[in-house]
């Protein structure tokens, strides 16, 4: 039989960090580090323009603002469907970036209660790829 996961009252909040380094015009090294309370997380890189568009939509569209009063939670919603899911520290080179472009690396951690009931705060790390 299939069992639904149990809910842990007062479970500690999940958090994570994102470090950006080794930038080239088309690549970036990202190190995602979850804390001990994080059982998994979603990550992605958005252009800074796309990231700001999502925040602005959450601030200005009443139907979205009602569901996501914190605009960053709207980004977390997209990460669940668009992002990569990880369970431990990841150190990766992201490729096929555009030279001279502003990006926002984002991460949405979750605790033992899962993504729906245990999502932590959005982690962000802005960076710009060099022109050459």
Q: Which stretches of residues belong to each language-model region?
A:
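Hydrophobic beta-strand core residues of beta-sandwich domains
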Residues: 22, 34, 97-98
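Extracellular fibronectin type III
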Residues: 1-9, 88-91, 110-132
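Ser/Thr- and Asn-enriched, surface-exposed coil loops between beta-strands
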Residues: 19-29, 130
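Proline-enriched interdomain boundary motifs that mark the N-terminal boundary
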Residues: 10-18
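Non-globular, low-complexity intrinsically disordered regions
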Residues: 65-85
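Solvent-exposed loop/turn segments flanking beta-strands in beta-repeat/beta-sandwich domains
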Residues: 29-68
